[in-house]
From Swiss-Prot:
Upper classification of the organism: Eukaryota, Metazoa, Chordata, Craniata, Vertebrata
All copies of domain PH, residue ranges: 611-717
Family designation: Belongs to the TECPR1 family.
Organism, as annotated: Pongo abelii
Keywords: Autophagy, Cytoplasmic vesicle, Lipid-binding, Lysosome, Membrane, Phosphoprotein, Repeat
Function: Tethering factor involved in autophagy. Involved in autophagosome maturation by promoting the autophagosome fusion with lysosomes: acts by associating with both the ATG5-ATG12 conjugate and phosphatidylinositol-3-phosphate (PtdIns(3)P) present at the surface of autophagosomes. Also involved in selective autophagy against bacterial pathogens, by being required for phagophore/preautophagosomal structure biogenesis and maturation.
TECPR repeat residues: 209-240, 254-285, 301-332, 344-376, 729-756, 953-984, 998-1029, 1044-1075, 1087-1127
One matching Pfam family: Hyd_WA
Domain of life, source organism: Eukaryota
Keyword Membrane set for record: yes
Protein name according to UniProt: Tectonin beta-propeller repeat-containing protein 1
Comp. bias regions, Low complexity: 1143-1153
Region described as Disordered: 404-486, 1140-1165
Length: 1165
């Protein structure tokens, strides 16, 4: 689960954050302002300060927020002076926007606010449709407006060129005041409340936010154009309301509720992608007539409310079709306010103690939760007082009698490891005097539940110099006095508390003072042991899973307030004695438990072991169907001590019992074949791989399949003597289901003569789920999931269904992934009713997949396999290729055809893509690399002779938004690296690759190719981009760079090789076609070429997604001359960039090679 942050405001206006991975409240970095309330998302936080002004806090990131400004220079040709800026009266402006209707001179483009800065000056964009233009960047046309081309023709009467300039948002990690360009007479009055949400409105562009605010006069305002690239928005819009609003809440989706002065609730209806402000209001009555609604908070599909008597209510029946719900349900507890987070988790602020509470037990099936739990996390400033006391105190207990009193702290340690509740009202904490001179200031301490009445006055007294306020101790114990020597008897006594400040009208808390001192001139509103009084909490940017609750509800073991102040000084000699004593005790225990029993004989000793079971088998003959079989795995030990196994499959044909057997030392892959109905897996042997017809077996349950898969995989590894983590030179691959496979390369795999056939490579599965993987010969492996999350390999093996002996005991972590399932709604036009779902008999299904050949309805479509679960409803996907209209439709003349987003007179059919998200949770040797989502990643391939220990490993990546990034600090000891370095580009990129000599090539979203110059270990980001012309009439989508070779893949599946690359001219000269039918390419450190072929015909079947190896690749023939086919049937990705294993040299390699045979594409159909 990625780290996220909970935001809170105390009564003094200070803003704090609490990370899901931490246990301390951290004071906001920019703490100069005092705030009333805040509303947070994952990337920013909006707030209303005490001056009633709106501020936004954008969290810092390695990727900057950049906006591109464009201006077009237009010229017309005349017979006297040629092209010039003198235009006709009917022409557009000489300097305009892309439409030509708006005047846009370069000096007239200004920054929108002081929070932006220019990156550079204006410059000409010399990229036109993915192709470089001539020097100057001019494009030509017959007239304005028309179709422009980069070539000048005889009838080119006008021309234009695009000037671009980037501005960068600089106010990050500080509170930036929201500017306003509105008329001062129309500016909104001071704001009283605001709420941020709407980032998951169905079909909405990624990064867009909805910011709603309420003014002191009860008016509702909406902030226009707020997005990730424009965090401030542009202007405020006023919305009409049926009454005066006092508070508002916006959820992540299309749910928006507000509170009226009269105690009723307002619900906004009609919120969608095209109208994020909604269309109408509906009124919801409060739970009771006596006490109206004071506060409301909404989430994805829940509504919580607090009435004026502090009661908490839950709204039943909330969904996307009924945002008003059906009825109110009262919850236990009294809160001043509640807030709903990203996944309907709920936080609140207690009515009496002003502490932050979390609603436990909130799940998709039980949205109301079960109970309230207080968050007992301390403040970050308190950590300095307790940084080493816990570890040193526990270390001292190992010395036995050297530290007395360790047994006394044991009960406290046991209690502190469990979840604790705050002391209730009236509970007092015992205290003893520390010094007689301070007895006059001593008072009894009470818990946070003991509050004053409104008649109580605030004592106008300050702590005496040298004293410090502290919060109540949640584990009261016997008070003692600290001793003078660190390694003698330890006694601690806690002094009484000096009365502290409290706000009138709010509960006052008292506690024991601590032993720490403040420097002169420094004061804090809370002492070390005080829990701050909260006024507001926001969980809009906090993601908490019900199965993985943060460590916010436990106190660190053995740490009372007095122990926090304790400082034990351990000398090196004492540390050495402690370690030696522990080692000696462990050695003696080993002798007692093992040495004394080694003379016993083994209870059971046998050389054959058999496991039997019932499975289903996909029979080899027609009609192909699943038949019930009995299977038996027989494992035996050979004469040489090696273990081998045979799998027997017993079946019945025409009442005759038969069987087939498979030697597991011949199995090259065990692949799960998960679908909607069967828990099946496939066994590949070299012969079955060539046939494209594996042995398929299915189990009754998922657990049975996992057991058999783990057992067979372990037996195969034992037969081949493969165990442990993969070697640094391993070849990694990914299937279309996201399964990860790894193969240990043989030295003969890249031999020029008699190379090892690909169908004999042994592939074993690793735990986890990825979309792509990239490896390096120094053991650094990165992966990217379907949800663009980056993962780094931890060095373990196993995970997922591989448990016990088939998995390492460490370096295995939880991993999740999210992907979208797409279906299409098809319609045909008729002259009577227009577009309807009634098509011709020859048409495709009206609800189908992308091909139209398979029927896929919204009700009948299931997740990809039983391991996936739906996490969203169906929504319209507007990001399909070709574009859509405002409703998501694409038009064409007929099925199937080329689709486009605008309707014409010749379009008789249309389709609309629907998507639904599903989630998978598994485990594997992978750790998440937050916080930037990635689209592509490339690690430098290193040849065997390269010196890799003297510098860090170069790693480049492309974010999901198209930003180019360079990872710093990557090494064998720190494979995740330390930080990202942003590399500026003029447009979004999709693919990137770095070669063994630091040559960086990339592909932009429009299919154009770029080369990054001057990349060195001392200059990891290089200096500039060089635009490389793409192959004629082709749009590239992927590039891979080896030691000296550069290969690229276009959108039509054609593989291209870059000719003419030399050290003095690394950009090369031209592209040469190598093959078609390719889906993915990977070039290794030896310039070896491996691809994933789209279709490969075997002797029995056709497989899609096959691993292929380019044969005959040599220095004098870098393109090779043929293909060798390996494992196939559902493979999506391969990475050979870690395989730097050279083949042994033969005597014939010195001879001149004969003429190469004719090259063939990797297709046999």
């Amino acid at each position: 689960m990625p780290n996220s942050v909970l935001w809170a405001v105390d009564l003094f206006g200070r803003v704090y954050t609490l990370s899901t991975a931490g246990q301390y409240w951290e004071l906001c970095k920019d703490s100069q302002l005092e705030f009333k309330r805040v509303s947070a998302t994952t990337q920013c936080c909006w707030g209303i300060a005490c001056d009633n002004q709106v501020y936004v806090y954008v969290c810092a990131s390695d990727v900057p927020i950049r906006r591109r400004e464009e201006a077009y220079e237009n010229q017309r040709w005349n017979p006297v002076g040629g092209f010039c800026e003198k235009l006709l009266l009917s022409d557009r402006w000489a300097w305009s926007d892309v439409s030509g209707l708006q005047h846009r001179p370069l000096d007239g483009v200004a920054l929108p606010s002081p929070h932006w800065e220019w990156e550079s000056d204006w410059y000409v964009d010399e990229n036109f449709g993915g192709e470089p233009t001539e020097k100057g960047g001019w494009t030509y046309a017959i007239d304005f407006p028309a179709t422009y081309t980069k070539e000048k023709k005889w009838n080119s009467c006008v021309r234009r060129r695009k000037w671009i300039r980037y501005r960068r948002y600089k106010s990050r990690d500080i509170w930036a005041k929201i500017p306003s360009k509105d008329d001062p007479k129309e500016l909104p009055d001071p704001f009283n409340d605001l709420s941020v949400g709407g980032w998951e409105i169905a079909e909405e562009p990624v990064g867009r936010l909805s910011v709603w605010a309420v003014s002191l006069q009860g008016k509702v305002w909406y902030r226009e154009d707020v997005s990730h690239s424009n965090p401030e928005g542009s202007s405020w819009s006023l919305l009409d309301t049926p009454g005066e609003v006092v508070q508002i809440s916006c959820g992540p989706h299309d749910l928006l509720w507000a509170t009226l002065w009269e105690g009723q609730a307002l619900v906004r209806e009609g919120i969608n992608r095209s109208n994020p402000k909604g269309s109408s209001w509906s009124i919801v009555e409060p739970p009771g007539s006596d006490n109206g609604i004071m506060h409301v908070s909404v989430g994805v599909s829940v509504v919580w409310a607090v009435t004026k008597d502090w009661k908490v209510w839950f709204r039943r029946g909330i969904n996307s079709h009924n945002p008003c719900g059906t009825s109110w349900i009262e919850m236990v507890g009294e809160m001043t306010m509640v807030n709903v987070g990203m996944n309907d988790q709920v936080w609140g602020i207690g009515c009496e103690d002003r502490a932050v509470y979390f609603r436990q037990g909130v799940t998709p099936s039980e949205l109301s939760g079960k109970t309230w739990k207080a968050i007992v996390a301390a403040r970050e400033c308190d950590r300095s007082h307790s940084g080493s006391s816990s570890s040193l105190l526990s270390a001292g207990c190992f010395f036995g009698d050297e530290v007395r009193g360790s047994g006394e702290s044991a009960p406290s340690d046991t209690d502190a490891s469990s979840e604790v509740e705050r002391p209730g009202p009236g509970q007092t904490l015992p205290a003893e005097p520390l010094d007689d001179s301070k007895n006059a200031m001593e008072n009894s301490a009470s818990g946070p539940g003991a509050g004053r009445t409104t008649e109580d006055t605030v004592e106008d007294a300050c702590p005496a110099e040298g004293s410090r306020e502290a919060r109540p101790n949640t584990h009261p114990g016997p008070a003692t006095t600290p001793a003078e020597l660190p390694w003698t008897n330890i006694d601690l006594k806690e002094p009484k508390k000096v009365p502290s400040h409290s706000a009138a009208g709010f509960p006052e808390t008292t506690s024991l003072s601590s032993l720490g001192l403040f420097p002169l001139g420094l004061e804090e509103p809370y002492g070390v042991d005080d829990h701050p009084l909260r006024a507001w909490v926001s969980g809009g940017g906090c993601m908490v899973e019900a199965c993985a609750v943060p460590r916010w509800f436990t106190v660190q073991a053995g740490l009372s307030s007095s122990v926090h102040m304790l400082s034990l000084s351990i000398t090196p000699a004492q540390t050495a004695a402690w370690r030696k004593q522990i080692f000696q005790q462990l050695t003696e225990r080993t002798k007692r438990e093992l040495e004394n029993f080694r003379h016993y004989e083994q209870a059971v000793e046998q050389s054959v072991w058999v496991k039997t079971g019932a499975l289903q088998w996909w029979c080899d003959w027609k009609p192909h169907k699943w038949v019930d079989v009995r299977v038996a795995l027989e494992q035996f030990t050979g004469h040489d001590g090696a273990r081998d196994s045979i799998l027997f499959i017993y079946y019945v044909v025409h009442e005759e019992k038969k069987y087939i057997h498979i030697f597991l030392n011949e199995v090259v892959a065990l692949v799960p074949v998960l679908n909607e109905t069967k828990h099946s897996f496939a066994l590949y042997t070299p012969e079955r791989t060539r046939q494209r017809w594996p042995v398929r077996l299915a189990a009754a349950t998922e657990q049975d399949m996992n057991d058999w898969l783990a057992l067979l995989s372990l037996s195969c590894c034992e037969s081949r003597k493969v165990q442990g983590r993969p070697s640094p030179q391993a070849i990694w691959s990914i299937t279309c289901k996201g399964d990860i496979f790894v193969s240990e390369p043989s030295p003969d795999l890249e031999a020029h003569e008699h190379p090892l056939p690909c169908d004999q490579m042994f592939w074993r599965q690793m735990g986890g789920h990825l979309r792509m993987v990239e490896a390096n010969s120094r053991g650094v492996v990165w992966g990217i999931g379907y949800d663009h999350t980056a993962w780094v390999y931890t060095g373990g093996y196993g995970g997922g269904c591989f448990q016990g002996l088939a998995s390492s005991t460490s370096n295995i972590y939880m991993q999740s992934d999210v992907k979208c399932v797409h279906i299409y709604e098809n319609q045909r036009w008729n002259p009577v009713t227009g577009y309807t779902s009634r098509g011709l008999p020859t048409d495709r299904y009206m609800w189908s997949d992308a091909s139209g050949l398979q029927e896929c309805t919204k009700a009948g479509t299931k997740p990809p396999s039983l391991q996936w679960a739906w996490v969203s409803d169906w929504f319209v996907d507007f990001s399909v290729p070709g574009g859509t209209d405002q409703e998501g439709w694409q038009y064409a003349s007929d099925f199937p055809a080329s689709y486009h987003g605008s309707k014409t007179m010749k379009d008789f059919v249309r389709r609309r893509c629907r998507a639904r998200k599903c989630k998978l949770v598994t485990s594997g040797p992978w750790l998440e690399v937050p916080p930037i989502a990635l689209r592509d990643v490339s690690i430098i391939p290193e040849s065997p002779g390269a010196e890799g220990s003297g510098h860090s490993i170069a790693l480049w990546a492309v974010s999901d938004k198209g930003d180019v990034l360079c990872r710093l600090g990557v090494s064998e000891l720190n494979p995740a690296g330390s930080s990202w370095l942003h590399v500026g580009t003029d447009q979004p990129f999709t693919s990137i690759s770095i070669g063994a000599c630091y040559q960086v090539w990339a592909v932009a979203r429009d299919g154009s190719t770029f080369y990054r110059g001057s990349v060195y270990p001392s200059q990891p980001a290089g200096d500039c981009w060089y635009h490389i012309p793409s192959p004629p009439r082709q749009r590239l989508k992927q590039v891979s760079v080896g030691q000296t070779s550069v290969y690229a893949l276009d959108e039509n599946g054609n593989l291209w090789y870059r000719q003419g690359i030399t050290p003095s001219y690394p950009q090369g000269s031209s592209w040469e076609h190598v093959s078609n039918n390719v889906c993915r390419v990977s070039v290794g450190p030896l310039d070896q070429v491996w691809v994933i072929a789209d279709k490969v015909q075997g002797s029995h079947s056709l497989s899609r997604g096959t691993v292929c190896h380019r044969t005959g690749v040599q220095p004098h023939e870098p393109k090779g001359h043929g293909w060798d086919y390996g494992i196939g049937g559902g493979w999506d990705h391969i990475s050979v960039r870690a395989n730097a294993t050279r083949a042994p040299r033969s005597s014939s390699q010195e001879q001149e090679p004969s003429a190469p045979p004719e090259a063939h594409d990797p297709v046999c159909c």
